[in-house]
Amino acid sequence: MEHLGPHHLHPGHAEPISFGIEQILNSPDQGGCMGPNSRLQDGDYGLGCLVPGAYTYGGGGSAAGAGAGGTGAYGAGGPGGPGGPAGGGGGACSMGPLPGSYNVNMDLAGGPGPGGDGGGGGAARRALSAAGVIRVPAHRPLAGAVAHPQPLATGLPTVPSVPAVPGVNNLTGLTFPWMESNRRYTKDRFTGLPYQNRTPPKKKKPRTSFTRLQICELEKRFHRQKYLASAERAALAKALKMTDAQVKTWFQNRRTKWRRQTAEEREAESEQANRILLQLQQEAFQKSLAQPLPADPLCVHNSSLFALQNLQPWSDDSTKITSVTSVASACE
């Protein structure tokens, strides 16, 4: 297969990358894949030097009559060449079994003769028997491919690959702490005040109930004595079949209740005393208004002063006014 030079390039069209047995054998006339004129340094082709026919479908057989079919993308073979009776589907360069990685088998021992019966398949088998594997990972392999890799031909010097991990297919069912939602942590973090989350709430104790006889004896003792000494409290607890802590707690609660009742009673008595005092003051004021003022001797002889002394604007009694006028006229 002849090599296309740069003068065959058309603007706007990518050059079809040729592929043949000569390039695999590093033929000097075609300038092998690793030659100085190869496209290894060309960044536009990427894997073109390793897989020359990775992006174009291969044509017919080689000019040397090897009988190997041209390989297209991912090892798709073309029709057999004129040298071999049966063209094989696979070429000398084949893709690896792992999806996402590429294995290029390069034949280093040479192809079959023009009359070989293997064709392209024979060249591929010979290439696999004496070729090295160049692995070019493109992306992460799928879980199914890693779990079930296809076996390669025996006797090949291969690069150590990733070993099969048991249970890789179940990776989707695995959960990790960092995958879990943070909502429950957020809920626990923002519920209530910070100091409420530090200590768990205390469990409430059931209320202690006493018998009627015990309560009556405690009330009698409390009316006689508001405070008990330690010995007295212990004797009372023993007599009532109670613990010392129960008697102590009951007296503390009873004193608190007694103080509250005493304060309420004092407040009620004070309000009642103030109410009685206001009532007495009002009655005294009403009596003072009802009693007549003693007549002044000076005012008795002066009618104007007498009228001014007996003037009561708040009084509606007209009889007083008439009496004042009669007294004044009598004095005159």
From Swiss-Prot:
Q: Which PROSITE patterns match?
A: HOMEOBOX_1 (PS00027), HOMEOBOX_2 (PS50071)
The molecular function terms of the Gene Ontology recorded here are: DNA binding; DNA-binding transcription factor activity, RNA polymerase II-specific
Tissue spec. comment: Expressed in various embryonic tissues, including branchial arches, some component of the nervous system and spleen.
Keyword annotations for this protein, in alphabetical order, are:
Acetylation, Developmental protein, DNA-binding, Homeobox, Nucleus
Q: Which Pfam families does UniProt cross-reference here?
A: Homeodomain
N6-acetyllysine sites (modified residues) = 238
Which terms does the UniProt entry file under GO BP?
A: animal organ formation; cell fate commitment; cell population proliferation; central nervous system development; lymph node development; neuron differentiation; positive regulation of stem cell proliferation; positive regulation of transcription by RNA polymerase II
**What InterPro entries would the database entry show?**
HD, HD_metazoa, Homeobox_CS, Homeodomain-like_sf, TLX1/2/3
User: A Gene Ontology CC term for this entry?
Assistant: nucleus
Q: Which domain of life is it from?
A: Eukaryota
Q: Which residue ranges run through the membrane?
A: none
The listed locations are:
Nucleus
DNA-binding region spans which residues?
203-262
What SMART domains does the record point to?
A: HOX (SM00389)
Q: What does the UniProt record say this protein does? A: Controls the genesis of the spleen. Binds to the DNA sequence 5'-GGCGGTAAGTGG-3'.
Provide the protein name: T-cell leukemia homeobox protein 1
The species this protein was found in: Mus musculus (Mouse)
